[in-house]
Design a protein with these regions (language model features):
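Non-heme di-metal
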Residues: 1-176
Length: 176
């Protein structure tokens, strides 16, 4: 979790240099990148003949990440009247999740990385809710933060069903 905290602090510094418009554009493309990785994890889980519920969870998370990207894109277009432009920065959530592909057969590792990724997303949506001037966007960001928390809990549940204990210090107090 210490690495996660450092990563979040670095990301906060990076975000602070962007305008609200740039942060929103960044996050749109980040959700799409995250979706691609969840699709890859679902494929790998199928190859490894892992439980169908885990495969389904990865697929659901991929679809939901795509939906989040689409929702954020609608907010962007409504707010700024144009299509978002890709921001040339690393996509933190996707970068963290991609670590799971380094050793996809190590299921506890994959689940831990995926759970950490969802916590990152939750915290970042909370941050967006704090900095936005748009009340409708604030509501959406808060909603998406809650959804990311449910993703974390779903992954934790999958781990428990498989008899895997994944510890992420401080995660349980992350909700409120």
């Amino acid at each position: 979790m210490e690495d996660l905290e450092k990563l979040l602090a670095d990301f906060e510094r990076m975000l602070s240099k962007l305008s609200e418009k740039e942060v929103l554009a960044y996050w749109i493309f980040g959700e799409y990148e995250e979706a691609k990785i969840y699709w890859k994890l679902a494929e790998k889980a199928e190859e490894l003949r892992l439980p169908a519920s885990l495969i389904g969870t990865f697929m659901d998370l991929a679809r939901e990440s795509e939906e989040h990207g689409n929702t954020l894109k609608r907010i962007y277009v409504r707010t700024y009247g144009e299509e978002p432009k890709k921001i040339d920065l690393p996509y933190i959530e996707a970068e963290v999740l991609a670590r799971a592909l380094e050793d996809p057969e190590n299921i506890p590792y994959v689940l831990k990385i995926a759970m950490e990724t969802e916590l990152i997303a939750k915290r970042l949506y909370e941050r967006l809710a704090e900095i936005t001037q748009d009340e409708n966007a604030r509501k959406v960001y808060k909603y998406l933060a809650d959804v990311e928390w449910t993703h974390y809990l779903r992954l934790k549940g999958e781990a428990e069903l498989m008899g895997i204990r994944v510890e992420i210090p401080g995660a349980e107090v992350a909700q409120y």
